[in-house]
């Protein structure tokens, strides 16, 4: 049974300061109330889906903050939990993200590669920048997008200020991340590094089918795909 948080007394947990949810997020996250022999239990929808090994990566509801350290910590914790729970069963990472911090995104990426289960990635809406990189980093053969999803790759964004030596240090760090991301994208897509470097010089948008041809994903998911044996 699915209810609004205003329809059930247990939904007051979403208003708890301990959850640290933005006000807009707490107002629209649905509650799932389950009946069992031991009574009622209420879950926010994301916790309930986590029981089915589904993780969502996106900006907070009502904002487009994207991937930051707090988001990365949450995703990493969920991946580690599911790895400990069942190391053989696939994990599904749904991505609708404008991107964000490179270092935070790499924390998620390294964890995806570290854990034992296959990580199936699926883009719905938008996977841009680091979101597209994580989409491509799913288990080969299990990287997907919905038909109207958009995928965008580009080089890391950054800026520096201060003394000349500080600017030089930051510039070297940006170039390191650019080179590393391009190498990994080349590895995941099968594209030559020269093409990756050229395509990521500016925002490079693709449809789901174009992303499949490029090698960022393996299949475009349709209703027929889901119904096929």
Curated annotation (Swiss-Prot):
Repeat among the record's keywords? no
Give the disulfide map: none
Report the main location listed first in the record.
cytoplasm
What is catalyzed by this enzyme?
Answer: Hydrolysis of proteins to small peptides in the presence of ATP and magnesium. alpha-casein is the usual test substrate. In the absence of ATP, only oligopeptides shorter than five residues are hydrolyzed (such as succinyl-Leu-Tyr-|-NHMec, and Leu-Tyr-Leu-|-Tyr-Trp, in which cleavage of the -Tyr-|-Leu- and -Tyr-|-Trp bonds also occurs)
Keyword presence, Protease: yes
Which GO biological process annotations does it have? protein quality control for misfolded or incompletely synthesized proteins
Q: Where in the cell is it found?
A: Cytoplasm
The EC designation for this entry is 3.4.21.92
Q: Where are the transmembrane segments?
A: none
Task: Cite the entry's keywords alphabetically.
Answer: Cytoplasm, Hydrolase, Protease, Serine protease
This entry carries the following GO cellular component terms, namely: cytoplasm; endopeptidase Clp complex
Q: Name one Pfam family in it.
A: CLP_protease
The GO terms this record gives for MF are: ATP-dependent peptidase activity; ATPase binding; serine-type endopeptidase activity
Which InterPro entries would you find in this protein's record? Answer: ClpP, ClpP/crotonase-like_dom_sf, ClpP/TepA, ClpP_His_AS, ClpP_Ser_AS
* Active-site residues from the entry: 129, 154
Family, according to the entry, reads as follows: Belongs to the peptidase S14 family.
Assembly, per entry: Fourteen ClpP subunits assemble into 2 heptameric rings which stack back to back to give a disk-like structure with a central cavity, resembling the structure of eukaryotic proteasomes.
Function description: Cleaves peptides in various proteins in a process that requires ATP hydrolysis. Has a chymotrypsin-like activity. Plays a major role in the degradation of misfolded proteins.
Q: What is this protein called?
A: ATP-dependent Clp protease proteolytic subunit 1
Q: Which organism is it from?
A: Thermosynechococcus vestitus (strain NIES-2133 / IAM M-273 / BP-1)
